[in-house]
Structure formats: structure tokens, C-alpha cells
């Protein structure tokens, strides 16, 4: 396996540093996740050690060892319909990733969105949102707080753009993945405005101005967009999605 060399180190030095670059770093991480999700992939192990900086200062996602593929059914379930094992790093895992019975929910963008919320909270405050987790003794309480959505709001009182960050964390750290922010675009809308634009951008799906389109969210064509109005215009009135049997 060959990967791009990232000479700038990982995200750890920025945790709780108060750096003015943190909103920009968050934006770059989200753009990376967006590129991943539009291709049907879910990272499932987002944490400081897995975000590296290139020589130009751009943040890059790394370590896809336990990434999930929405296009592969066996990523989501074993032959019994339940996940084989629990993978990930407990401090950053959403409740459904810890629950063996909810394995199908871990191959959704909402898994990474929860992990991003934990990571962004740690970047801003220097601490984890659900309390200390320096040893196994604190794990059960940490997970209980995560399951209840009991993240430490007091840590945000001194932050600039506090209300925006609160809304972002409320949407990212919701314990119910169905009520959580459903896409990276939603998270970006709540990210405090920054003046600097990243040098590199991930894939962004085209937008339609007139007419209708359909975006495939499951299967081998995940992320593909069909411009329905154009198809109808040229006489194609039957659109077959998926394999013909």
C-alpha cells in the first residue's frame, strides 16, 4: 500500500491550542469526509492521529483500515445479519457503533459526523465532550453520557462564535443517528465563517437550477446524479437503477 507523504504531523498539537486555524482545519476535514461519503465510503475511525497535514498545510484523512463501503453488503453485516466485531476508537464512536445490534447504522455518513463532533470539540476545548477517558474505569460513564447526549456545554462558554459551535455540536453529537446531521453539507452550514478558503476541495456534487434530478444513495452507483429533465428531453422516459435480472 502506498500513500501520499504528509510531512506536517498529525492533529494532536492543535488540541486545545486556541489556534485561529481550527475552524479552517475543521472545514478541511469536512471537505475530506464529503469526498469520502459521496463515493459511498465511511471512515469509521476519525481521530487526531488519523488527520495528517501535507507540506502545504492542508489537512488530509488517513488510515482507512476499518472504513466501511456502503456498496458492499458484507461491510455492514455478516451472514447472520449482525456485525461481527466492534471496530473504532471508543472516545470517538457514536452509540450505534458500540452497539453490536446496530451494525448497519455504522456504514452511514452519520457515524463520521458524530466522530467529527467529538474531534472538533477536542480541538476547541482540549477535552473530550463526554468527560475524562484516561482509563477503562471511565469508559462506561463516558459511553452512558454519549448515549444520553450529555456533552459538556460549559466548555464552550468562553469561545468565540459560541452559539454557532453549540448548534454544530448539538447536531453532530445527537445520540440518535436519525436525528443527527445527515450530511457534511449540514455541518458546514453551521461551521463559523472563516475568511480563508482551503487550497484543495473534495468532490462536490453538481447542482441543478432547472428541472429535476435523482441522486443514488445505495448500491454500486452511490453518489451518481441523473438529470431527469435532460433524459426526458431526449426521449429517455425509462430509467433503470441497479442491475437488470
Feature annotation, model-predicted:
Residues 1-10:
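Conserved short submotifs of the Hanks-type protein kinase catalytic core
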Residues 25-26:
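Activation segment signature within eukaryotic-like protein kinase domains
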Residues 189-245:
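Intrinsically disordered, low-complexity acidic Ser/Thr-rich regulatory segments
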Residues 80-97:
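Conserved activation segment of eukaryotic-like protein kinases, specifically the C-terminal portion
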Residues 31-41:
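Protein kinase catalytic-loop region centered on the HRD/HxD motif
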